[in-house]
Regions:
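S-adenosyl-L-methionine
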Residues: 1-21
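Conserved class I S-adenosyl-L-methionine
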Residues: 23-32
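A short acidic, Gly/Pro-enriched loop at the edge of an enzyme's catalytic core
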Residues: 78-87
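Conserved beta-strand signature within the Rossmann-like core of class I S-adenosyl-L-methionine
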Residues: 110-121
């Protein structure tokens, strides 16, 4: 099992959101070893954890607050998830063809919390290939008029390792 702690930024954003909003459903998209899923489930949130790797999912899905699904989100004629969530978390996952699908997972008055690598990360490590790195302010620009951006950061982060990332919190205000 991976022992990396959840992203402090993700944890802080969830705490800010949950102080002011009733949260019933959270989805962790491309969750890997589930560092965010486990953290949130241990805080008694109901979490849906999605990943392509069953072996990774198997390491943490014995938690009663986690429902998991092994899905390849990049190999479907249709988007396999047909639900809405109060919080949608995406960390270190980038498949541009799914931006619209990810946005559509967010309930009205729900939140998208997205953190991933961007151009500039090449000097710090993987990923280095352009197709796995967001362009300048790209994450900020994926939202449409159904969303209000609550927080955006682009720059260096130091934990767990030094990297160059974009981080976004957006609230869905319309369906």
């Amino acid at each position: 099992m991976n022992n990396i702690n959840p992203s402090d930024w993700i944890v802080n954003q969830v705490e800010l959101i949950t102080k002011k909003n009733k949260i019933n459903t959270i989805i962790d998209v491309a969750c890997g070893f589930g560092r965010h899923s486990v953290y949130l489930a241990n805080k008694n949130y109901k979490v849906v954890s999605i990943d392509i790797d069953f072996k990774k999912l198997r390491t943490f899905t014995n938690n009663k607050n986690i429902r998991s699904a092994c899905l390849n989100l990049e190999n479907h004629e249709y988007w396999p998830i047909q639900s809405y969530f109060d919080i949608v978390i995406v960390v270190n996952y980038l498949y541009r063809s799914n931006f619209k699908n990810i946005l559509n997972l967010v309930k009205k008055d729900g939140y998208l919390i997205y953190e991933t690598f961007c151009i500039g990360n090449e000097k710090y490590g993987k990923p280095k290939r352009k197709e796995y790195l967001l362009e300048n302010k790209e994450l900020k620009n994926i939202t449409d008029n159904r969303f209000v951006i609550k927080d955006f950061y682009q720059g260096i982060v130091s934990v767990p390792t030094k990297s160059f990332k974009q981080m976004l919190v957006a609230k869905r205000v319309a369906m």
